[in-house]
Swiss-Prot record:
UniProt xrefs under HAMAP family: Nuclease_YqgF
Protein name: Putative pre-16S rRNA nuclease
Principal localisation: cytoplasm
Top-rank lineage group of the source organism: Bacteria
Single biological process term from Gene Ontology: rRNA 5'-end processing
PANTHER family linked to this entry: POLYNUCLEOTIDYL TRANSFERASE, RIBONUCLEASE H-LIKE SUPERFAMILY PROTEIN
Enzyme class: hydrolase
Coiled-coil segments on the chain, per record: none
E.C. designation(s): 3.1.-.-
Localization per Swiss-Prot or TrEMBL: Cytoplasm
Length: 148
């Protein structure tokens, strides 16, 4: 069975301790678009519940978390372990596919794009960079899978 022919909906997530950027793509076009940010909650369980409501609302079939792999293998961040825990919680709550995707430097790339290409001020960039980073993460994932 060709997986690209099935109805698919992807949620890209750029996790941050304060804000979580979101992007969405669905078949047949699978074009990732930023859909905004959600505020991180006081616990990972509450954050997972907030994300699960978006997952259900948009009938998401696959969640793609940006996984900030360290540039040096010996270093692992606390954010990385939070992402792994949050991904596991979402998978338990929804039983859908949750993928951790290498997102090294996606936030920096998003910030550069917004600064140079859009002419946004610092506050505007701050509000847009997380969802743009999620869009870059989801785009990278979809490109690698050639799902379009």
């Amino acid at each position: 069975m060709n997986i690209a022919k099935q109805q698919q909906a992807f949620l890209g997530i750029d996790y941050g301790k304060k804000r979580i950027g979101l992007a969405f793509a669905s078949s047949p076009l699978l074009i990732p678009l930023p859909i905004g940010n959600v505020e991180a909650r006081s616990s990972l369980t509450l954050t997972a519940q907030a994300l699960v409501s978006i997952i259900k609302e948009r009938a998401v079939t696959t969640v793609v978390f940006g996984n900030p792999l360290p540039m040096q293998k010996a270093y692992a961040s606390s954010v990385q372990s939070e992402i792994q825990e949050l991904a596991a919680l979402i998978q338990e709550m929804t039983a859908i596919e949750v993928i951790l995707w290498d997102e090294r430097l996606s936030s920096a790339q998003a910030e550069r794009m917004l600064k140079s290409d859009c002419g946004l001020n610092r506050k505007q960039r701050k509000n847009s960079s997380d969802s743009l980073a999620a869009t870059l993460i989801l785009s990278s994932f979809l490109d690698s899978r050639k799902l379009y």
